[in-house]
Regions:
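C-terminal, loop-rich substrate-recognition/catalytic regions characterized by aromatic stacking residues
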Residues: 1-284
Length: 284
């Protein structure tokens, strides 16, 4: 997608008095909520997980927003909440507290918060990524000691989102997220032994609370398009080598500035390739 429909929320200040924290335990069996308890959940995901991530900084063009997350969810470790009986509005940053153990000195943890519709489609609400070597200090990162317990609080991106009644909230955890994260030099397995998700729940209604003023823009430039704009976003799989790649192409087409006659044309190709068998062959 290139955009999502939404509404405006108006707050007198932040933090808002209409936002309250709600904690959901990560429970055995993959439940999000419930009584929680001790876990022994291994997390080790394939290097090519993440092709549905979209652009890191989307501008609203050419399907730059994250797509259906169901495929990436299937390759992740997921905790899923009960079917919502009423809409749930989120405003702010969700926080994920975990106790983790790594079997390697270098590892990542990635968390995606998703809205799962009754038909199974999954929309990414927010995500967070952490190089666990930075978990104690970003200024002085240090290698992990395999087997040691690591207490982590991962703050996800700020979000403003409303889940509909009948949908579910899903937390998807992974150790990889290509191409947002470069692969670790060797696959790490994390063991999750305890966790809780803290949600910023907003108490506002469904109606828009603010109407923005009409946008102001410069006069449209005087031009003629000689050939159309084309955009391509595809995933390639080499069935011989096993390599997978995200390919993004943007062809501007030929455009003439009618004020002075300059004709321009631009072509852009991006390729993000990863080898599931060898992280050192990652290419971008």
């Amino acid at each position: 997608p290139s955009a999502r429909a939404g509404r405006w929320v108006a707050e007198a200040g932040l933090p808002s008095a209409r936002v309250r924290d709600a904690g959901l335990a990560l429970s055995p069996g993959g439940a999000l909520g419930g009584e929680g308890g001790a876990l022994a959940q291994a997390i080790c995901t394939p290097p090519d997980l993440g092709f549905a991530a979209g652009e890191f900084f989307p501008m609203g063009m050419n399907a730059e927003m994250p797509g259906d997350q169901a495929g990436d969810d299937a390759a992740s470790v997921c905790f899923e909440g009960a079917v919502l009986e009423a809409p749930l509005s989120l405003l702010g940053a969700a926080r994920l507290r975990m106790t983790l153990h790594s079997d390697k000195p270098l590892a990542f943890i990635v968390a995606r918060l998703c809205d799962v519709a009754p038909d199974g489609t999954s929309v990414r609400i927010a995500h967070g990524m952490l190089n666990l070597c930075h978990s104690k200090s970003r200024e002085k990162p240090s290698r992990l000691t395999p087997g040691d317990a690591l207490e982590v609080e991962l703050v996800l991106d700020e979000c403003a989102y409303r889940l509909a009644a009948g949908h579910r909230l899903r937390l998807a955890l992974s150790t990889t997220y290509w191409p947002f994260l470069w692969p670790s030099p060797e696959p790490a397995t994390l063991t999750l032994t305890q966790g809780a998700l803290i949600l910023p729940c907003h108490e506002g209604g469904a109606a828009s609370e603010w109407t923005p003023p009409p946008p102001r823009a410069a006069k449209e430039w005087n031009h003629h398009r000689h050939s159309p704009h084309r955009a391509i976003r595809r995933v390639e799989t080499d069935l011989i080598s096993g390599k997978r790649a995200l390919v993004v192409e943007d062809h501007s087409g030929r455009v003439e500035n009618l004020d002075h006659g300059l004709i321009t044309e631009e072509d852009m190709v991006e390729r993000f390739e990863v080898d599931p068998k060898d992280p050192f062959l990652a290419y971008a």
